[in-house]
Structure formats: structure tokens, C-alpha cells
UniProtKB/Swiss-Prot annotation:
Keywords: ATP-binding, Ligase, Nucleotide-binding, Protein biosynthesis. Pfam families: Amidase. The active site is at 72 (charge relay system), 147 (charge relay system), 171 (acyl-ester intermediate). It is an enzyme of class 6 (ligase). This is Glutamyl-tRNA(Gln) amidotransferase subunit A. Its EC number is 6.3.5.7. It comes from Aquifex aeolicus (strain VF5). One of its GO terms (molecular function) is glutaminyl-tRNA synthase (glutamine-hydrolyzing) activity. Allows the formation of correctly charged Gln-tRNA(Gln) through the transamidation of misacylated Glu-tRNA(Gln) in organisms which lack glutaminyl-tRNA synthetase. The reaction takes place in the presence of glutamine and ATP through an activated gamma-phospho-Glu-tRNA(Gln). GO terms for biological process: translation. Heterotrimer of A, B and C subunits. InterPro entries: Amidase (IPR000120), Amidase_CS (IPR020556), Amidase_dom (IPR023631), AS_sf (IPR036928), GatA (IPR004412). PANTHER family: GLUTAMYL-TRNA(GLN) AMIDOTRANSFERASE SUBUNIT A, TRANSAMIDASE. GO terms for cellular component: glutamyl-tRNA(Gln) amidotransferase complex.
Amino acid sequence: MLWKKSLSELRELLKRGEVSPKEVVESFYDRYNQTEEKVKAYITPLYGKALKQAESLKERELPLFGIPIAVKDNILVEGEKTTCASKILENFVAPYDATVIERLKKAGALIVGKTNLDEFAMGSSTEYSAFFPTKNPWDLERVPGGSSGGSAASVAVLSAPVSLGSDTGGSIRQPASFCGVIGIKPTYGRVSRYGLVAFASSLDQIGVFGRRTEDVALVLEVISGWDEKDSTSAKVPVPEWSEEVKKEVKGLKIGLPKEFFEYELQPQVKEAFENFIKELEKEGFEIKEVSLPHVKYSIPTYYIIAPSEASSNLARYDGVRYGYRAKEYKDIFEMYARTRDEGFGPEVKRRIMLGTFALSAGYYDAYYLKAQKVRRLITNDFLKAFEEVDVIASPTTPTLPFKFGERLENPIEMYLSDILTVPANLAGLPAISIPIAWKDGLPVGGQLIGKHWDETTLLQISYLWEQKFKHYEKIPLT
């Protein structure tokens, strides 16, 4: 049962030649065949191609030699479809590899599939995929979270040991919480966005899902670092996280923002989080209340900035150069209008309209410009809090995973499921969600937010918690 082994264990076996990359891929392919019909995590499975590629892998010393990885379908993999779960890109084939994919391939990894998401990464439940919803492996009547629901579910059911996602307002951390896995969003600029289909360019960041901290740390190490093709990627040295994670963390101060606890938290989530904090206290962490006075404006700020950037980024899908084109139209203007009307789903249209309004003449200063100023205030609140504490902690989501359809009628309800994750994106801070409990058979995630460029501390606390709680031993659908 190779699919039950962690990435680190697989690495050892592969390095020593005790198993071959082909055998590893076959094992995860078997697991995919057992679970995929129920969960529907993938838009395009690529196990067959990975098996062929596995045969030509020779360099055992590579950091990810023979390791299968699933990839969110808004990240380009050369020669494969990249649909963004949208009708408008249903048949689009990526002409090149995203930088992160290039780095994974160089490290010896094998891409085993493109995973489902909310269309163009806009959503919190993967219900907005134009193709089908992905299901939560812990309860098939509930959502896996979003927008990276497919990536989170694939790691939860172990059809892949690790996966890549993107996080604009919580799209890695929220599904990680709902699916009971680890999900990290690095500092903005830590990982190249070249080849990630843009949603909101000043917020998007690629990150990693996994079941073990060490696994997540290693993959993050491989994909991080400056890239000349992305002007927002930073020339900051990449730590050896795969080694750093095991180092002892002592004497840290953890801040609890009082504003986060003024939101309505589901009792099960509140109880799980309080227990998590008690356990950390026992480990010698000092717990301190901090204040983020402007954080209450995060959701309105985010829902001006993100849709504004999206309306600009999505203007390119007009039926001219690539993607879907309407069949019947009288002139070019009607072609644009029809293509976009038929190609985009309801949530994407909603956000394009919101953004176009916020950027329109006469409203730009009142909305977009003002939101950017509030964003600065939110960032300053975090910087001030980090003068007193090393890490900020909160639940990842205010509720347990919700049922399908429960929030579709009310977009604001859906938006509020990201209320605890959006602030880290606005401030460009690194943040991780780790499984802290199972309540009523459903996973609960705890979020840790770090100082800029300090993913190390987040991973170290995650590793420490994992040693105690051993959440990775729980596997759904077995």
C-alpha cells in the first residue's frame, strides 16, 4: 500500500531503489480508481502519462524523484488542458509550463492530474466549477471548500501525496481545513506566479497541500524563489524548510486577535480551537491577546480589490485568440458579448460586474483607491501586532464544512466563509491551516499567520502539532 506512505518515506524507498517511480504512480492510480467516482477531485487525470514518464526517470538523487503531484487546473502544464473549470477555457491547451511546474519536473516529480476548482478560482466550495462539484471525502454531502477543492480532496483521499493550489483569499487554507489536511499559502512574492492564470494579481499566491508537514515543506522549498519571469517574485533566500521543520520551537508568543473572536464561530469550531490553544500553552508557548482594529473591513476591502483586478485580468477572454468563441454573431461586438455571456458562469460574471463598477469613472476613488488605503491600514495592524508576538492564530474557518447548495442562494454567506483567511492575503503574509480536531466526524482547521518571509515558524509549529496529534493517520473512504 504505497499510497499510504508519506512523501518522505516514499523518497527513501525510491532513493534506495526498493520501489520504482512506476510502482509508486501505480499505487496512487489504484487509489484514484477506488475513490474518484465518489469524490470527483480531478478535471483531467494524467496517471497514464505519468506512468510513461516514470519509466524514463533515472536520477535518484533529485529531491522529488518519482513523487506524484496533483495540480490545480489554473496552473499551466505544457501540452495539457488548463480549463480553470470554465466553459470559456474548456479546450485550452497550455503552450508552456508554469515556473512551479518547471521546477517540480526538474526535481523529478510526476504530474498525475489537474484538479477541480471554482471557476477561475472564484468561490469557497468548488460548486462554481463549470463541470461538476468536488465532494468532501469525509462526508460526500458536504463541500470540500474552495476554490482549490479538488487539490485538497485529492490529498485527503490520497490519490496524490501532495498537491498545488492557489490562494487569493483563502483558497488553499479553507479547503485544507474542510478536508482535514495541511495547506500553506506562502508570503506574497515567495513563489512565482508565472503560468498561474491570474484572478487578482496582487493577492494570488501558489501554495501546497499535504498530510505531513515535512512533505509540504519540501515541495514548497522546490517551488519557491525568485523568477525573472515574474516581476512580483522576490529575491529572498529560500530556507531549507525540509530540515528546518524538525528544529525545536521554544518560547514563542502566539497572538489571538480579539476581533477574530467577535465573529460568530460555530460552537464545535470554537471548542476545537480553544483546545488547540490550551495544548500549545502546555508546550510552553505564551498566549497573548492582540488587536487588529481594521481587520473588520477585510471582506468589503477584498471584494472591491479582488473583483477589480479580476475584471481587468479576465478582459482577455473575448473569443479572439484562444478559448471559447460564440457560434452565432452579427459583428465583432456581438461576438465579444456572446462569447463572454455563454462562456462565463454566474459567480465570475458577478465579480466582473462588481469590479468593473468599482473601477469605473467617478467611482474609482470612492471604491478601489479607498480599498487600497484600508488594505494598508490592515497590513499596518498586523505589523504592529507582530512587534509583540511571533505568530497569530485563529480558526481557519468559522464553521464546519457546509452542505451542497446551502450557500449558493446567498453570495454574502459564501463570501463570509473566508472572513478569517482574507486578511493574510491583503497583508501579503504567510499563513498555514493545520488539522486540529474532528468534530461530528468532520475536520476542523487552525490557522497560523506569520511575519513576512517567516514560513519557517509556521511549519515548525505545524510539525510539533503533527507529532502530538498525528492527524495524518485519519484517512477517509477506507
